[in-house]
């Protein structure tokens, strides 16, 4: 989503609160909980899950391994739920032609550097760069080339934009910033 006026362009960036992350977190939580319950039921020799009789699983070595996988999956699932709740990666890109400043803001993990803010002068922007990698895992990424600082990505690597969409976005941004476009 973006908002534009004559002098300001604000591009909102979606973070980790995506449907795919929710689905993976739920699937991982339920699967690892199932593994852990089967491992515990093999240790207790009771059926904690009625669909699967615990007598078929010996605690050593299958029950221990399933318990370990269940715990590992719960840790990974809790990590996913934390990134979703903190909305890591979300933020905005603000281009202000009137003041000549570009602000790139992202939310990070809690701690000292939770808020990530880059402030740049528009005069330091060399170009808008499109990087295209075709093949099995094709990706198209939009970068802003800065003098002395390298390239700053403006789109996510998992954002699957069509060639037409990325070209249009690059052309509009380059026109707004009055800089050239480079394609790699």
Curated annotation (Swiss-Prot):
It is found in: Plastid, Chloroplast thylakoid membrane. One of its GO terms (biological process) is photosynthesis. The chain crosses the membrane at residues 22-42, 57-77. One of its GO terms (cellular component) is photosystem I. It holds the Pfam family Ycf4. It is a multi-pass membrane protein. The keyword Transmembrane helix applies. Keywords: Chloroplast, Membrane, Photosynthesis, Plastid, Thylakoid, Transmembrane, Transmembrane helix. Its main location: plastid. Seems to be required for the assembly of the photosystem I complex. Belongs to the Ycf4 family. This is Photosystem I assembly protein Ycf4. The gene is ycf4.
